[in-house]
């Protein structure tokens, strides 16, 4: 037998193969032969682009099949001649396949002489099966009669490629499901082979012509199946559906759970030089309008925190209790409702997490999956997703190596994933109002055993965001325990009188109000500075403040902007993106976070900022409250907020736990004059220097409480 070399390699998948000695192979193709564990062999393809999976063998013997001469000539002529042993190979391919699974027997040839590297030269002889070829809508009747194949040419359809396959090719970048890259030279299947029943149709889906694909078509594109626009396809359409109703995008994001080592490192902030200033603040406790005296908990060792949690507290860097913690720990243990107001960075999160978790662990009142659902003992509501995620990690930190489970429930992540996590057992839920309300309504969260309800940044949810009715609805669910059987706690750095009135409706009559220092006082560890400017000069002032040359848009490599973390607050989402583009041009690593970004992007942005990979964060109101980020040295108010409470929360992102911080605000008399009287009083209370121009401008301001302007606050949908 002549064994002249050839470049042709053959891959076969069928029930039973001929012995290797009967198959003519070249030196090149012989390296592709593989054997399974039973000693049976199969051909592999030499090219690396093809899969090298071993062929599956049948338990039954294959029957020989007679090949018609027309089919043999068609294949041989397309390859461009004959080679030794070719007839034997073709005979081996066309055979009966009666394996256990009824899968068709196919062979794929890869030959440089043909137009398409993939075509089928075998068909299943099972009368029930249909010959299926990739990229075509062909049906073929194949019958077995006395060991021969009968195929009628009029039964072979050469219809155009399906849109589904074209979309799959585009999505995979031209890589077919077979694993090989399409080449420009292989633009279609041979008409000879296609007429004989072989090959894959490669007709353009767009113009219906043969020889190219829709992605390469020069003819005008077909119109969008959704809106009718010829300039794009349906999968790129941003319009509403045909019925005129805009359907919400399906959320598929599943957050990555950080490792505990990362959590301890990320949330650990060492006490600064001004930590003792917290203990100089005055403390007031009032219940039913009368002062209350209780014994404060001066250290964590004096509390009833379990030993396992106490080790985590020490590992987190807590050395002594702050004033808000000293009075909250005993009040929670006594079962009191609490309305607490303390300055930013004073440890309010630990003030409610530690006593609640301690009581639940000591009393062994925990939710397990064996209870048949999610029966949380504590629900913590927050105004933003980022704050919910932070409190969730704080809870993980304190409950590390304990049996307690704490889970986040907020919008922007996959609903099914969120439900599956809490259904495994969840003692404490931390979430935003919309998602928690949703899960309560559909029964995923059962409130029958809820003992604690905490509202963090309560003034924001009740007043600014208008979630008072939703909070009341959650409290008034029929299965939610009443006030006398449930503790309700509210915490914030600011509590306007109007919010206090609304909050009293959610608390017991004998609730205790804790005030550290003064309600609405700014953090004295933060140095507050101001720049008088107009709208057009803000950009230049910001760049100079960050050490960027405004003429060349360059930054020195040893500039502080690369080392110290800076948060820039703006009023509008578009301005955040614009400033980020400007800083990117100046080679300053900056990133944005606002309500228009998807939750996956927001989480990634915050993580990059925390790690220092992006030391400049340009943000709207979504991060102005509650976030505890290590190493924030500078806060810049590019746009002033619409009230003094938001200003206090913004500058409170720096100067945490007694560390010094710096805040710079750009003041435009055309836009910000109405907030100046409140700002002057805040500076005086914080023992800060008040600029003379600010005093002068504030003296001529009337009705300072009616200050409103367009600002990008957290929309109600954000809570979902």
From Swiss-Prot:
Enumerate the InterPro entries for this protein: DEAD/DEAH_box_helicase_dom, Ded1/Dbp1_DEADc, Helicase_ATP-bd, Helicase_C-like, P-loop_NTPase, RNA-helicase_DEAD-box_CS, RNA_helicase_DEAD_Q_motif, Znf_CCHC
**GO MF terms held by the record:** ATP binding; ATP hydrolysis activity; DEAD/H-box RNA helicase binding; JUN kinase binding; mRNA binding; RNA helicase activity; zinc ion binding
* Superkingdom of origin organism: Eukaryota
Which Enzyme Commission number(s) are listed?
Answer: 3.6.4.13
Question: The motif Q motif: which residues?
Answer: 298-326
Task: State its location(s).
Answer: Cytoplasm
First-listed, main subcellular location of the protein, grouped into a coarse class: cytoplasm
- Keyword Cytoplasm present in the record's keywords: the answer is yes
The first-level EC class reads: hydrolase
> For the Helicase C-terminal domain, which residue ranges apply?
549-698
Give one Pfam hit by family name: Helicase_C
Q: Per the record's keyword annotation, is Cytoplasm included, yes or no?
A: yes
Composition bias (Basic and acidic residues) maps to 141-154, 162-172
* GO biological process annotation, one example: cell differentiation
The protein's name is ATP-dependent RNA helicase glh-3
What is this organism's lineage? Eukaryota, Metazoa, Ecdysozoa, Nematoda, Chromadorea
Q: What is this protein's gene name?
A: glh-3
